[in-house]
Amino acid sequence: MNNMPTIKHVRAFTVRGGGADYHDQGSGHWIDDHISTPMGRYPEYRQSRQSFGINVLGTLVVEIEASDGTVGFSVTTGGELGCWIVEKHLARFIEGAKVTDIEKIWDQMFNATLYYGRKGIVLNTISGVDLALWDLLAKVRKEPVHALLGGPVRDELTFYATGARPDLAKKMGFIGGKLPLHHGPAEREEGLKKNLELLGEMRQRVGDDFWLMYDCWMSLDVEYATRLANAASEYKLKWIEEALPPDDYWGYAELRRNVPRGMLVTTGEHEATRWGFRMLLEMECCDILQPDVGWCGGITELLKISALADAHGKLVVPHGSSVYSYHFVITRHNSPFSEFLMMAPKADEVVPMFNPMLLDEPVPVNGRMKASALDAPGFGVRLNPECALQRPFPR
């Protein structure tokens, strides 16, 4: 261990348009259609999520260089705010440390930012640093990240697809399809009727054995979510996802008691750290946890979240995040399948989530991915040199 390199530099960049901020898409993309959101109570912000600024956060690229010249990197969301946090605050805990000091660095970053952090943009940033550290260490050791996490427990990953066309996802070999909920409580009975009509139409198209789920993106209240779940049981809705605001643990516990027997309640995309997920688990808020590894605290924290979930008999199915979640899921028994975000504008083909920003990003084939597709050192991806990185706060 004494010959392990130290960390020489950490640098933070952003990039304009798309990248890791997958909401930053052009017009006509399904992800910016009329989708139910917490802002749906305001008619002027109902038609497009970009209208209220869902795409303003931007991409954060964290690059960490070791004393032997090895470079690890990651991409997440955070933009210029994340760059400022890395360069002005977190760099002091990273530079000069050993590449193996991942746990210590995480602890220092989290505790040093408690007075203005805990969740949100700060945890996105800490997650980005953490992922870059895992990428760096794995490259130094010339191993894939999943080898550092204990190695694969299965030969392949199995995926469900998130997008506007579950019927097409079935033809592509996915085990299920998760639809965005289009109409929230502010659109009243007519909106609820349209939600159920779409679900019924998709059930007709895909048959009885294909999973269908609704992603509600924090936009409902307990009453509406309960009504939706009960009515949707006719169409064999497998789960209702992120129905309530992430801080409403009490509401989630009530909703889980209310939904029809056999239907699952899932959440956690916008939760962070082991302490947030501890609340979800101990209050019996959900059946599946869905942390985003680029937002919840990185791999270091996701390992703790997963252990907590396993002790409570719950599954962990990370939100999106491509290779950053694939390397984790392949090593965990309580993560039996993965999410794949359909980033084609019409959700009609399989394209890499971070295209064109990352090169060598693997994608499912017929809804599956061999473990061997993840065997390159680190997370196995490269930054596209054609993406113009900007470093707003150089030191």
From Swiss-Prot:
Residues that coordinate or bind substrate: H23, R49, E339
Co-factor binding details: Binds 1 Mg(2+) ion per subunit.
Catalytic activity: L-rhamnonate = 2-dehydro-3-deoxy-L-rhamnonate + H2O
Enzyme class: lyase
Keyword Metal-binding included in the entry's annotation: yes
Subunit relationships: Homooctamer; tetramer of dimers.
Name of the protein this chain belongs to: L-rhamnonate dehydratase
Organism: Polaromonas sp. (strain JS666 / ATCC BAA-500)
